[in-house]
Amino acid sequence: MNRQLFLPLGSEIEKSNLETVFFTFLLSQSIIFLMSEGGSTVLSKTQNQALYELQKELWGYAEPGFLEHKSAKAMSGFLRREGFQVTEGLCGMDTAFVGVWGSGRPVICLLAEFDALYGLSQEADVAEYKPIEGMATGHGCGHHLLGVGSIAAAMIVKDYLEKNKLPGTIKMVGCPAEESGSGKAYLARDGFFADADAAITWHPSALNVVSSGSHQSCIQCYFRFHGVSSHAAGNPEAGRSALDAAELMSVGVNYLREHMDSKERVHYAYTNAGGISPNVVQAEAEVKYLVRSTTNPKCQKLYERVINIAKGAALMTGTTCDVVFDEGLSNVIPNFTLEQVLEEAFFEVGAPEYTEAERAYAKQFRDTYPLDPESEVTAVIAEPKTLIANIQNSDICDIVLRHRCVDECSMGSTDVGDVSWVVPTAQINTACYLSLIHI
């Protein structure tokens, strides 16, 4: 990890860095304001209502990665109306955009995600599973809130800088395809963050707490096996089964698991099993693999081992194999200084105060969800277990929790990691889920 990014709070920091820290402090407050009842007290009632309607609009669109055309148009149009200079089609991605306001330093990038997932269609405000007819996608982890919350933060910072006649540039970055596609990796690759002093993001969660530590590096690819078709009963000796090769590859990878690091993961899914006729030797088969490890070099080494297994499977079956790279994500480099600044802001603003009606609304959803008494609490939380237990037994988290700066790797991946390799980056989580979910 690049330890130069970990600026100690007690050290001598040049003026521009102090401005960056202050600006970050303000920006983090802005995000949290949106979570209070009725929206932000800084924004007008009209603005708050418009933001509320925008998140409903994004929920309704629920567009998957790189296809978020309606969502991106709605968000970029909103930014234009609020006085931001908007540029669309960043780094060859149709649905990537940035809204810029201000001038001079510091330059802070606020990251916004807005893509949805397949298989998660759901009507809004319904506590039971009820997919929308004719719709396959839905927002599974609150990206409709994520994007709109980031816009609200940018608006509040703009208002503050205008009223106080202060220098500084805010960039509200619309980042497509976080769930699958790694939109931020393309932005980082093409130097989009070259002039940025810091990047801040947030994510809906079960808790109000600053995020710390790393996330896994990962590589996603397709293994396409090509064989020879024949009649499986009358002429089996002439066939070379691509499906056999895919299955043997999976067997080999499963034997590999014993000889991997305990924090490494390999997942797979059959995307083409060769057809639906068992009496025909399958000439084509495809498997999608996702390889994860704690750092980029370790992930690359594990990926190469998986490739060798695929080659062996092809050799055993007399088939050939094409390896088609799909996407890759870097591990997250945490920035402990920004984390501490974010936490100071979090505690100054405090958690939202929920009304009884809001708590009753949350309870409707909790009553449909089985309580898991074995649910583990992430190591990033620096609070007594008794306090965490009380939160898990409530409907929604209504306090801010102290976090622990940890140099550990969480299980999971995000393209925020690619941003963290090129600019100091930090993240907060705010309670938008039930307390017992995904802690």
Placement of each model-derived feature along the sequence:
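Acidic-enriched catalytic cores of C-N bond-cleaving enzymes acting on peptides and small amides
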Residues: P236-N272, S277-V280, T295-V324, N331-P384
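Short, positively charged and aromatic/hydrophobic N-terminal segments
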Residues: P8, N17, T24-M35
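Acidic/histidine-rich
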Residues: T355-E356, A360-Y433
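Histidine/acidic-residue-rich, glycine-tolerant segments that coordinate divalent metal ions
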Residues: T95-F97, L117-G119, E128-G138, H144-L145, ...
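Conserved small/polar residues in nucleotide/adenosyl-binding loops
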Residues: I437-I439
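Polybasic, lysine-rich low-complexity intrinsically disordered segments
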Residues: N2, I13-S16, T20
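Acidic/His- and Gly-rich active-site-bordering loop/insert found
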Residues: G38-H139, H144, V148-A152, I156-G168
